[in-house]
Swiss-Prot record:
It comes from Orgyia pseudotsugata multicapsid polyhedrosis virus (OpMNPV). This is mRNA capping enzyme LEF-4. Belongs to the baculoviridae LEF-4 family. The keyword Hydrolase applies. It comes from the Viruses. One of its GO terms (biological process) is regulation of DNA-templated transcription. Its EC number is 2.7.7.50, 3.6.1.74.
């Protein structure tokens, strides 16, 4: 790269609290740990998104282009916190002063504090204009977001749903960790997340819990797909463990999705049963964590952690949860966190149902099963590529029963020429889990959590 071009990589986190809480964090935490700021400057953005940074003795103008904007979740073991972070890669290109527009779009005054190698930026936004300002106030933010999505343009400074006037100055707190290479050091990332947890803990007594659209939230919790299914041969001492990173028993229950929030947990199963309880969230940060689960009799087993949704603050609508900005949890992070919860928490009483538990994952090799206290029908395997596979002794499919013809149907049509073997009364239009052999279809159980039959390969 030339002298006028700079590639910058950083991990970023924004503290999303009201103004009074941000100043509380500044006075009671940041200033006590770092009495003197490391740097002060003022950023001016023109109409072309060129940033001019003015310090006490210099002024430099650059145009920042976003090359990478990736959301991820880091698990902080010390406090069992799932910290939602953003990894950014930007290209900064120097701009001559005579090419900077005279029209100022934003003016931000920033004070930078250095804590454990992390830049803690306390910002005062004196002016901020954007595409939303030209529309009616109640719908402006949504219209601007829609235009951005339709045009396919990523904004380096995304519009915020805020109102600034002559008597309003918006405060913001941002944490940034700059790094070089493929990824930041694990110790640096842990120290970064420790700062996040310690700062946000100062707001715990405010019990921030905005209203949530639970149906939309659970619909957003998409379970991971199985990339393959492998049959286990009968009589083998243990299945082949080649390429296995972690494994767990495949529970034979009703699948569901749920969400943890502080003081409350909600579960919806695939057969449209709802379970809710006022229980404490096991995680260190006040966020929404979605999960996949399996309901077996009177027990709910959390089998996977899927996403983190953050609460956000603006001075128009106060606190809200943006369900369009999910932070995905990697499969290996979810497995490590579940193992920690299995050992540290064990079971949580669930009033009116039974209890909530966390599934345990094991290191290879896969162990043969002789006796278990809960029904299982195989293994769940996480391979070295962090893809899920299921190992079963008897691969099954979901088929729909058609009473007039007396046949079972896949999604492609009736399966003819095979004997239907069933120990239960079959109902027209119901979906059943079945095992197909050369000459017969063995009906194992009814699947009220399935609406349509599956494909038979």
């Amino acid at each position: 790269m030339g002298a006028d071009v700079l590639i910058e990589q950083e991990i970023s986190y924004t503290i999303n609290f009201s103004q009074d809480l941000l100043y509380l964090i500044l006075d009671s935490y940041i200033k006590k740990r770092c009495a003197a700021p490391a740097e002060r400057y003022t950023d001016l953005y023109d109409a072309n998104n060129v940033r001019t940074r003015q310090t006490a003795d210099s002024a430099v103008s650059v145009h920042k282009t976003n090359l990478r904007d990736e959301r991820f979740v880091h698990w902080l073991r010390s406090s069992n916190a799932l910290v939602p972070l953003v990894r950014r890669e930007n290209r900064e290109t120097a701009v001559p002063h005579d090419r900077v527009s005279r029209h100022i779009a934003s003016l931000i005054e920033t004070t930078v504090y250095k804590l454990d190698g992390v830049d803690v930026k306390f910002e005062h936004v004196y002016m901020q204009s954007g595409p939303a300002d030209r529309y009616e106030s109640t719908a402006a933010h949504k219209i601007a977001a829609l235009k951005t999505a339709l045009l396919g343009v990523d904004c380096a400074r995304p519009s915020q749903n805020l109102q600034l006037g002559s008597d309003a100055v918006l405060a913001r707190v941002r944490l940034e960790l700059e790094f070089e290479g493929a990824a930041p050091a694990a110790a640096s990332l842990d120290a970064f997340c420790e700062l996040v947890v310690q700062m946000e803990t100062l707001a715990d007594h405010h019990n921030i819990a905005p209203c949530l659209p639970y149906t939309t939230l659970l619909d957003s919790a998409t379970p991971r797909r199985f990339t393959r299914e492998q049959r286990i041969a009968y009589g083998a001492q243990a299945p082949d463990s080649t390429g296995v990173k972690k494994w767990a028993f495949k529970l034979d229950g009703v699948r569901g999705r749920g969400a943890f929030r502080r003081g409350y947990c909600l579960v919806q199963t695939d057969d449209m049963q709802l379970h809710a309880a006022c229980i404490s969230s096991p995680f260190g940060l006040n966020n929404v964590v979605t999960f996949q689960c399996e309901v077996v009799a009177d027990k709910i087993f959390v089998t996977d952690l899927l996403q983190v949704f953050r609460y956000k603050y603006n001075n128009r609508t106060q606190y809200e949860c943006n369900l369009h900005d999910a932070y995905p949890i990697n499969a290996d992070v979810a497995v490590e966190c579940l193992n920690r919860l299995h050992c540290a928490v064990g079971s949580v009483p669930w009033p009116g149902l039974g209890e909530l538990r966390f599934q345990q994952f094991f290191d290879p090799p896969l162990a043969p099963t002789h006796y278990t206290t809960i029904p299982i029908d195989g293994y769940i395997v996480l391979d070295e590529q962090l893809q899920y596979a299921k190992y079963k002794w008897l691969p099954t499919v979901e088929l729909e029963y058609d009473a007039p013809s007396g046949a079972l149907h896949s999604i492609d049509g009736p399966l003819l020429g095979k004997t239907v073997v069933a120990d239960l009364q079959l109902k027209h239009g119901a979906v059943y889990e079945c095992a197909i052999t050369d000459n017969a279809i063995n009906v194992l159980k009814c699947r009220p959590d399935r609406i349509v039959p599956s494909k038979v390969c």
